[in-house]
């Protein structure tokens, strides 16, 4: 769901292709767009993935909701965000369909699909998702570009879906609002160092409610009330602690939380910057 002002010249497009944008799998994938490069009308997010072992670039809360849902699904193997649809393919589709190709200052622009997903044990081995606010579907030009995108994936014989804010699970929305309603702590080395002791506590207190345990830890170590929960919140918001996004965070037991065991420090610094 690229925003306005993310246009590129032919030279810039060629450079991005040479850089490997939109290429690779898993931890080696490079998204066509990053949060630094695209103005956003809302919040953008950089979040670590347990599945891919890299930081993902999400341009809205709606993209985040879809990403967290995909991250939780055990059948999902790989998530590639901001996947480019190169003009070498889409230009001919536009001609055949009679739809004007996106052009800025005389240059055919690269369209992008928000997510290309690889799966196992599901109805599809691979599928694509475009994320849009429901209100955007009232715009005729938006619908035209979506039709180009639909035809692109149809030619590839890959199922393509549109996801809007109307489809957001209310519990998922609640969790996102709680995790990201205020600026979370940056992922410093000091904060990351808390993962190991937190993992021990979560294992030891497995059947107890996470909120109650956080209060117990604060009291036991004479910490400011809310300190432990704040650390868990920051680590969870940045993807280093995983939980069932379809269940209210406050209702989770300690055993419901999964702490990342492998963290790429270079990627970690990138999240914090």
Curated annotation (Swiss-Prot):
Known outcome of mutating residue 144 to A: No effect on recombination
GO cellular component terms given for this protein: chromosome
Entry EC number(s): 3.1.21.-
Residues where Mg(2+) 1 binds: 114
InterPro entries in the cross-refs: Restrct_endonuc-II-like, TnsA_C, TnsA_N, tRNA_endonuc-like_dom_sf, WH-like_DNA-bd_sf, WH_DNA-bd_sf
Residues engaged in binding Mg(2+) 2: 130-131
Top-rank taxon, per record: Bacteria
Protein name: Transposon Tn7 transposition protein TnsA
Organism whose genome encodes this protein: Escherichia coli
Gene of this entry: tnsA
């Amino acid at each position: 769901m690229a925003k306005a002002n993310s246009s590129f010249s032919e030279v810039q497009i060629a450079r991005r292709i040479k850089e490997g944008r939109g290429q690779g799998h898993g931890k080696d994938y490079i998204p066509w767009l990053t949060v630094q490069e695209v103005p956003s009308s809302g919040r953008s997010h950089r979040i670590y993935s347990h599945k891919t072992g890299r930081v993902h670039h999400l341009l809205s809360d709606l993209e985040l909701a879809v990403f967290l849902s995909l991250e939780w699904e055990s059948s999902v193997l790989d998530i590639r965000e901001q996947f480019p649809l190169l003009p070498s393919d889409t230009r001919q589709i536009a001609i055949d369909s009679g739809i004007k190709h996106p052009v800025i200052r005389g240059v055919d622009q690269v369209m992008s699909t928000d997510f290309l997903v690889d799966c196992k044990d599901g109805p599809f081995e691979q599928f694509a998702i475009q994320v849009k606010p429901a209100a955007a579907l009232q715009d005729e030009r938006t619908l035209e570009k979506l039709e180009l995108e639909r035809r692109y994936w149809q030619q590839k014989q890959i199922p393509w879906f549109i996801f809007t804010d109307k489809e957001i699970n209310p519990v998922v929305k609640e969790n996102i609002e709680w995790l990201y309603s205020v600026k979370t702590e940056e992922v410093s080395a000091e904060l990351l160092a808390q993962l190991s002791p937190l993992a021990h506590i979560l294992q030891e207190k497995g059947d107890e409610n996470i909120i109650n345990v956080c209060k117990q830890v604060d009291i036991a170590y004479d910490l400011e009330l809310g300190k432990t929960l704040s650390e868990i919140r920051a680590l969870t918001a940045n993807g280093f602690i995983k939980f069932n996004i379809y269940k209210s965070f406050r209702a989770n037991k300690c055993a419901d939380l999964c702490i990342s065991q492998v963290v790429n420090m270079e990627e970690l610094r990138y999240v914090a910057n």
